[in-house]
UniProtKB/Swiss-Prot annotation:
HAMAP family: 16SrRNA_methyltr_F. S-adenosyl-L-methionine binds at A126, A127, A128, P129, G130, S131, K132, E150, D177, D195. This is Ribosomal RNA small subunit methyltransferase F. Specifically methylates the cytosine at position 1407 (m5C1407) of 16S rRNA. The active site is at C248. GO terms for molecular function: RNA binding; rRNA (cytosine-C5-)-methyltransferase activity. The gene is rsmF. Keywords: Cytoplasm, Methyltransferase, RNA-binding, rRNA processing, S-adenosyl-L-methionine, Transferase.
Amino acid sequence: MSHTSRVFFPPAFVEQMQQLLPDADEFQRFITSSQLPLRRSLRVNTLKISVDDFLTLVEPYQWALTPIPWCQEGFWISRDDADTLPLGSTAEHLAGLFYIQEASSMLPVSALFDGGDMPQRVMDMAAAPGSKTTQIAAHMGNRGAILANEYSASRVKVLHANLSRCGVSNTAMTHFDGRVFGPALPECFDAVLLDAPCSGEGVVRKDADALRNWSQSSTEEIAATQQALINSAFHALRPGGTLVYSTCTLNTRENQQVVNGLLEQYPDAVKVEPLDTLFMGAERATTAEGYLHVFPHIFDSEGFFVARLRKVASVPPMPQPGYKVGKPPFTPLNRVQQQEVIAAAASVGLRWDTELKLWQRDKELWLFPSEIEPLLGRVRFSRIGLKLAETFPKGFRWQHHAAVALADAASANAFELNSNEAEEWYRGRDIYPERDLPASELIICYQQRPIGIAKKVGSRIKNNYPRELVRDGKLFTL
């Protein structure tokens, strides 16, 4: 059976899908749906703004926002101005008020926190570009700690940029093959999300050529990697903890069989927690085992698979790694030093929760989530928490990323930009406001939300927006 649509379907893939969807009408719905444009969707970042306040803020734009059933913060979006202004160039996106995220990919984190679970230490084993890490951080309210790992070096920078834009402060980043965590950090996490690398069969609506390199042999190779990763994730999970395994592919080899492989290996230590009541209508995509197997035609979305597992008992540990990590190059501040920094930061409108602790490396001051401290020296971190400031004989140079996460828009030194000035800010240009500036160090705000920190130099605001984030092209002033 051949298809001459814009989407490339390998014959063996079509045969596989016919076996998965033996009803001819349903199979045809799958084929038809897979060739339709994917609906755009976003998730409101509640670290920055409530859903109600966001809806009020964007109401003048006349965006058509349809709630996503499995994510209270998620909406499908239709815009009349989509051709004139990219969604990623809107002021609300640049300020981290929302994340452009495919609807199905919101499912794994919703499953992770289903039933009121509130883990204190979470690992996102394959984290880039950051949609799920930022979603986890929002669920946790920036409390506790997240270890966000990404194996692909080219994606680590994107992960950090998204964490920063969204004001995430409770995350430590690593850059490893996920197979290291079971041996290196056994029983260290209350929850683990493994959104596993996969063959991507569910993303053809976004990429018509996604299946060009598809083959059953490559599926087998990928599944072997997934099996090793889920085993590592399970060992890193403490007894009583939750493991969510997900992919954006459709075949059972990378989905049900990988999860069932873990169940067969540890039959007395793993319990499946069914997802049929995760949201209204979830039973339409629930398998006999209790997993979610979302085909594109069921909810008019990408294809996705999600399983939620509970670790009910310890298992024999994996062999310990032979390498030594070495002592991290940071030292905690003493109480007097902490009080000095806290007071200085508060004077410019920067405040943080007591779960964040002050550490120093040379002239750099950092805020580490305290939940990550027991892991220091056990794996090498590429970045931990927030860089707060650099120290100088005359004071501190406060950092942009810390301001975005910690600044108080109601502080005395907050300065609200108009839309033209905000555009100039994101373009990396100094600003020349025609009104008085309240202080020498300013929390820069737009729409009553902090978007950076800057110094007053005479009558101008010296732009401190990071060079790597500076935007060109059309921005939000139409």
